[in-house]
UniProtKB/Swiss-Prot annotation:
PANTHER family: NUCLEOPORIN-RELATED (PTHR21495). Pfam families: Dirigent. Glycans are attached at residue 125. Residues 1-24 form the signal peptide. Dirigent proteins impart stereoselectivity on the phenoxy radical-coupling reaction, yielding optically active lignans from two molecules of coniferyl alcohol in the biosynthesis of lignans, flavonolignans, and alkaloids and thus plays a central role in plant secondary metabolism. It is found in: Secreted, Extracellular space, Apoplast. The keyword NAD does not apply. Its main location: secreted. The gene is DIR1. Homodimer. Belongs to the plant dirigent protein family. It comes from Arabidopsis thaliana. This is Dirigent protein 1.
Amino acid sequence: MAKRFLLLLPLLSSILLLAVSVTAYSTTTPYQGYKPEKFTHLHFYFHDVISGDKPTAVKVAEARPTTTLNVKFGVIMIADDPLTEGPDPSSKEVGRAQGMYASTAMKDIVFTMVFNYVFTAGEFNGSTIAVYGRNDIFSKVRELPIIGGTGAFRFARGYALPKTYKIVGLDAVVEYNVFIWH
């Protein structure tokens, strides 16, 4: 028994010495009081351009055909799409939609969207919102969750209501109404 204790003594001493020598760091900030949340409604147009000499979205991957339908299941697109005040591509740019979308349904045209909407003009210049969700592009009513943000939209939550404004070939203009609590 004493022999066993002598073997364990260096191990126990090392553990005790390590526990004493390790320090933890923690700070506590005093409560500053209740800060009321803001509610913001944003309205802009999203321009997804796949065709032409200067596309804003490009295909980076495509799965082998898995269905006889022409749905393009498994296509992944990367985008840096302009966000503008009006539906015309030459209207004032207010930001960029940077992220990716993937065709994730075998029987319908449905995209899973993963985007940061980066605002480059106006009151929210430099701020972003993070949008993630299912986008069934032929549904009349669509809803995408806002899951976070930066700058003025830090800790943001809310939802976006995209509505297809115009489709020409594979290019689309989508009207967005975004409702954010931050």
